Amino acid sequence: MGNNKKVCLIIVDGWGIGRNDHTNPIFLYKTPFLDHLKQNYPYYALQTSGIASGLKYLEEGSSEVGHLILGSGKVIYQAKTRIDQSISNGEFLKNKILLEAINHSKNNNSTLHLIGLIGSNETIASKEHLVSLIYLARANGFNNICVHLISDGKDGPKNEILEIIENLNKESTTLGSINIASITGRFYALNEHSEMYIDKFFKFLISNNQNQQEIQYLTELKTKSISDEFIEPFAIKNIFKPISSNDSVIFFNLKPNSFPIEYLANKLLQKETNISNLKITSLVDLNQKIKSVY
């Protein structure tokens, strides 16, 4: 007879090993079943961050990273780690796919649009990658850049976008102006559940009829208790340019096969949009239509 023993892997998302004090709700509440398992069966801890998860030392993990490692049964270096390494060793500045995207706008005298999330939690996108993209473009003699920031407010503090932008400008003095062209909350730009909100972001990006504001408009939103996640798309006066024919777009988010980004990219490429000769690139894989870098 065959071996009829069964194994069941149950992933309790968000559950972890914490301190035995008031900061740990798992410790404060009764968990008799799990206590029984610990008392009667062997167990051990898994590290869900840093090098063990294919990230930088001490870097915070995420559910996407954890599920990938568990499913593969081995450490897979995340896109962020690979990109960070390429920036450190100089390979990023020689990347053919990125240079193609920049030269497309350069040769067509058009605009390079950089689109991605920005926040203190860098599991979805990285400020360093954004700065490196701007540096790469300017190192190749191209300055016509529009940065479309997606504010977080979900995986990080609720109102940090203005502070992050101020710090970004301070840290990037050698680059000159970052050219922030628009800001949109992730509820609209990265909504996993409703295409309607992504459509609003899409129409915003291709239209000239915008809610035009100064960057300090973010202070007004904060006083109204509007968190970064729910900021409706607004354009920065005198900087915003809509995505148009002959332009180039680089998405710098790090989540592969992201539905919102893939949906947005596909919308931009539709014939009905009437945007021709548009070049779209992503740092990570979206689909077979879009060139990916890593």
What are these regions (language model features)?
Residues 9-10, 147, 200, 204, ...:
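Hydrophobic transmembrane signal anchors and adjacent membrane-proximal interface regions, especially
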Residues 14-16, 248-253, 259-294:
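Active-site loop/lid in soluble adenylation, ligation, and acyl-transfer enzymes
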Residues 2-8, 16-187, 276-294:
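Active-site nucleophile/metal-coordination loop of metallo-enzymes that catalyze phosphate/sulfate
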Residues 21-22, 29-32, 53-54, 97-100, ...:
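Short alpha-helical segments and helix-capping/turn motifs at coil-helix boundaries
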Residues 29, 93, 128, 196, ...:
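Short coil/turn linker and secondary-structure boundary residues
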Residues 1-2, 243:
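Short, flexible hinge/linker loops that cap or flank conserved catalytic cores
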Residues 156, 160-244, 256-259, 263-266, ...:
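Long, well-ordered, tryptophan-enriched scaffold segments
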